[in-house]
């Protein structure tokens, strides 16, 4: 997950949507913090090992609670991401089959039609969150790898102009 910038190796964004009032009251742990009612985290990591040391407990907790997981990953690291999830006891095959785990590559999320379009990305997130509710999951945890934003990609400068989430 090494990006072009030597000081920023990996970045993640995590957001959540609850399906019911009781779910929004449950504490959610991320690293050494408890997240409040409005939950969004942007984290930068120095290495993949550091990234997964922080993310895996957070991800596993969601699976144990029966929450949906939506992960956007570097396509070159998809298999490694699944291996890391499996290393903490998550049955990724079963989770994908029953809809608890949904994985998308950058090109199928951030970079649809070959460029970043913030409005389309936000529409996708809304769609995924609504889908999680319709499937009966109490909460959807979104983990999104953002290293692509450090590359020269069409639309990447729109991240600087617009600030949403």
Locations of regions flagged by a protein language model:
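Elongated alpha-helical scaffolds
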Residues: 120-123, 127, 135-149
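Conserved small/polar residues in nucleotide/adenosyl-binding loops
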Residues: 164-165
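Flexible, compositionally biased loop and terminal segments
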Residues: 29-37, 71, 88-102, 133
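A conditional alpha-helix N-cap/helix-loop micro-motif detector
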Residues: 48-52, 118-122, 159
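Short, compositionally biased "basic patch" segments
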Residues: 1-12, 17-35
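Long, charge-dense
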Residues: 81-125
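Short acidic, S/G/P-rich loop/turn micro-motifs used as interaction or catalytic elements
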Residues: 48-50, 78-79, 109-112, 131, ...
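Glycine-rich P-loop/Walker A and Walker A-like loops and their local beta1-loop-alpha1 context
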Residues: 37-77, 81
């Amino acid at each position: 997950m090494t990006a072009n910038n030597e000081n920023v190796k990996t970045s993640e964004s995590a957001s959540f949507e609850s399906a019911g009032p009781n779910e929004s009251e449950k504490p959610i742990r991320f690293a050494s913090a408890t997240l409040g009612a409005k939950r969004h985290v942007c984290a930068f990591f120095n290495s993949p090992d550091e990234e997964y040391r922080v993310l895996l407990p957070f991800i596993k907790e969601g699976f144990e609670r029966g929450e949906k997981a939506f992960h956007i990953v570097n396509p070159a690291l998809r298999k490694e991401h699944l291996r890391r999830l499996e290393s903490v006891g998550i049955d990724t095959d079963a989770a994908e089959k029953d809809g608890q785990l949904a994985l998308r590559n950058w090109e199928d999320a951030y970079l649809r039609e070959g460029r970043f379009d913030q409005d389309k990305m936000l529409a996708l997130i809304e769609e995924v969150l609504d889908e999680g509710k319709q499937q009966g999951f109490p909460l959807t945890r979104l983990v999104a790898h953002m290293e692509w934003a450090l590359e020269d990609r069409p639309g990447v400068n729109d991240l600087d102009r617009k600030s949403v989430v």
